[in-house]
């Protein structure tokens, strides 16, 4: 009996964050022994998601349509634009705060050592949105890491170049912390007490 396909399945599970060799083996064996129907459902949904989910042309969030539901919602405040590093960060803010503005998802943060510069984060597109004149406040909600702070500084400079007031989330964000792991109360307080970037 060939185990080549089983090895491929185990390797495929290892692409998930936090999944090492042992966990991948347990997942593969569990699926084959007890969850074949669930595994088929997972394969079908995963295949459709990879085929149909792209990025919103306005905010760069994941979306099945050209413009996501938040950007298409005419009741959102178009004068406020909140910049986050990732879709989970946007979701955390959306669930924990009463924020009703729009978003821009960087899909990362500035990291010259990793070859991630302004172009990779879509900052040329962000600059065009700021130049359009609709945004009056840029809310910078990057993580409190070295790269996040560097990105925040760059974003503040970009906002000022367009005559837009930049603000930064404050109080409650631990240094080195990631937004998606904060509790709702902490994130809501930090969002409500954001300060202007100096």
Swiss-Prot record:
Supply the name of the protein.
Recombination protein RecR
Highest taxon of source: Bacteria
Taxonomic lineage is: Bacteria, Pseudomonadati, Pseudomonadota, Gammaproteobacteria, Lysobacterales
Q: Which GO terms describe its molecular function?
A: DNA binding; zinc ion binding
Stretches annotated zinc finger (C4-type): 56-71
Q: Which GO terms describe its biological process?
A: DNA recombination; DNA repair
Give every Toprim domain span: 79-174
> Which SMART domains does the annotation name?
TOPRIM
Q: Which family does it belong to?
A: Belongs to the RecR family.
Keywords annotated in UniProt: DNA damage, DNA recombination, DNA repair, Metal-binding, Zinc, Zinc-finger
User: What is the documented function of this protein?
Assistant: May play a role in DNA repair. It seems to be involved in an RecBC-independent recombinational process of DNA repair. It may act with RecF and RecO.
């Amino acid at each position: 009996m060939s185990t080549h396909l089983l090895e491929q399945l185990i390797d495929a599970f290892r692409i998930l964050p936090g999944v090492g060799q042992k966990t991948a083996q347990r997942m593969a064996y569990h699926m084959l022994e007890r969850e074949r129907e669930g595994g088929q459902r997972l394969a079908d949904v995963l295949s459709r998601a990879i085929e149909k989910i792209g990025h919103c042309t306005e905010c760069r969030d994941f979306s099945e349509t050209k413009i996501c539901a938040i950007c298409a919602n005419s009741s959102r405040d178009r004068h406020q634009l909140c910049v986050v590093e990732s879709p989970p960060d946007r979701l955390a803010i959306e669930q924990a705060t009463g924020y009703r503005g729009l978003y821009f998802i960087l899909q990362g943060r500035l990291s010259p050592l990793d070859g991630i510069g302004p172009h990779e984060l879509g900052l040329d597109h962000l600059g065009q949105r700021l130049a359009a004149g609709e945004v009056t406040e840029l809310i910078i909600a990057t993580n409190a890491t070295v790269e996040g702070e560097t990105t925040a500084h760059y974003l503040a400079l970009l906002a000022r170049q367009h005559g837009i007031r930049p603000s930064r989330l404050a109080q409650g964000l631990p240094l080195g912390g990631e937004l998606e792991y904060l509790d709702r109360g902490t994130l809501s307080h930090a969002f409500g007490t954001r300060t202007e970037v100096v």
